[in-house]
Amino acid sequence: MDPGRSPPVQPFPSVADDRAHGLQAVVDSGLMTARMSSQNTARNIGTGSADGVRRHFASDNYAGITPEAWAALAEANQDHEPAYGNDRWTQAAADRIRDLFETPCEVFFVFNGTAANSLALATCCQSYHSVLCHEVAHVEKDECGAPEFFSNGSKLLLLPGDLGKLTPAGIEEAVRRRTDLHYPKPKVVTVTEPTEVGTLYTPQELRAIGAMTKKHGLRFHMDGARFANAVAALGVAPREITWQAGVDVLSFGGTKNGIHVGETVVFFNLELAEEFAYRAKQAGQLCSKMRFMSAPWVGMLSDGVWLRHAAHANAMASLLHELIAPCPGVRVLFPRQVNSVFVDLPKPVIQALWDKGWLFYNFIGEGGCRLMCSWDTREEDVRAFAADLRECAGG
């Protein structure tokens, strides 16, 4: 068996039960949890909560580990297990992912999203190929050239698109733009679901892109750093926006949804997975004590936990949007669809909020801000931030 590759084992009933009861029921329970999260809790504007602990809106990476992931991690620490992914936890986690997507697939665990994206893309192309991505894609803006590095030079070709999304027409134009030997041959399309600006591809849009990639013999990669939030928001089965839409390989994110470290690379195109274990090892991505990366996935993929936490984060962002959109000087930049709210704020308001101790990113032009909710965001935090924003904006 290849180190780092998990053999298929029998499906776990808990994942199958989620399908039997319907994904929407799991999402609904998460929304109910979100609505009830602050009942009987006094709000303190100065601290952001009654207990003095404030949840911020800079990134879902700021949040801690979910109780379910933490419990699984602790349980995995009870005894000795084989190393390099040959342990029962890694086998169980990989099996739950296969069951979640309802199809045979190869599953690999890596340390972070940059590794997941870069190694997945490198597997899909040669150095003389190019990768078509949106001009604001994470692989372009926030991965320090890693996709080009790990593919030995495959060029990223940047495409425009409204709301952070690629279109079939844009892909076809890029493929046909040049076909001569002096131009890097397009070989892969990568999309981010949800996008860098918090918008969603619908299943229909993804199927259309998948059909275009098939038409031109391209591979189809999905950056799913917040894949759970997309599934929760769309109310679809994971298969509907991945392999059934033509996706060959998915970077399935766990860190932003409450896992301590580690993403998975899920190959629906099994041929592409051949020798990926060697690529991961060479890139320093083979964890010797792999169970401590994989065990939290077992906890998260039990009884719909992963989806409930994502639905809660989405619901908190929906409430945040509802509370701050009417405030003076606030301009919403993109539709709120998952766990992020993008707004333009006057610079004095941004500074005043920072002075009050709130942490959030301001990286879109002069006043563009991203406010991100996470699995542990509380309603009291949202209302405290909204109240401070209204005060700072003079509303």
Feature map (PLM): residue ranges:
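Cationic, low-complexity basic patches in intrinsically disordered or flexible, solvent-exposed regions
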Residues: 11
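Conserved PLP-enzyme active-site core in the AAT-like
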Residues: 30-356, 361-377, 385-393
